[in-house]
């Protein structure tokens, strides 16, 4: 009985004519000189990254970059200010630092660092406002959910070792979850804006009715040390006078304020300085002012 011939399942490589290849290489060189990575170039030109690498290995039309060099050039593409976190002088700067303290991630890849912010689709507005403040609106990317119990998300990635190092100097470093630190700017306007940023990242507000009366509760979530510092700050400004404890729960702690009169006054201070805010939470505060 004759043996059946095996089927060749290997993928065929796409063949490019000499002229096509020449034009593609010209485009690759141009985009590479503009600072785009090989991954970006392959997506933009619709050509496999391995093909670009193979051609470059043969013809040496550009020199591959290190991760750090690639990050710096990507910074130039988006034209953001790498010194943004070097000196915190405005409420919006303090807000962004506060938000990153609560919900940002600094990745240290030894040769380079990057900052990543990820928000749920419903809060895309805040990511747009932060990216506008940093002058990198085009860097926002959509992340489609992978499962039915997940949400669609938007992300903002900043490839800048300088900006990450400045954040680390402020006290916002890699692997900070559970070890967030309160940053004292020694300036009341900056401190309130910073607290608002942290609240938008790791805080919550509930407005409800009970027995015909309007009620509210505001909370901050974090590690014990961070929340104690927040409590000290609030008490120094005349708030949380009757709050003397922090609620322990699995993996973190909560700090609650439940006096509606106090929460109304707190809202006025939180939103007094700077323009960046999470509209969803601001609208809940605003409902108390009616």
Sequence positions of predicted segments:
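Internal intein/HINT superfamily modules and their associated LAGLIDADG
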Residues: 2-290
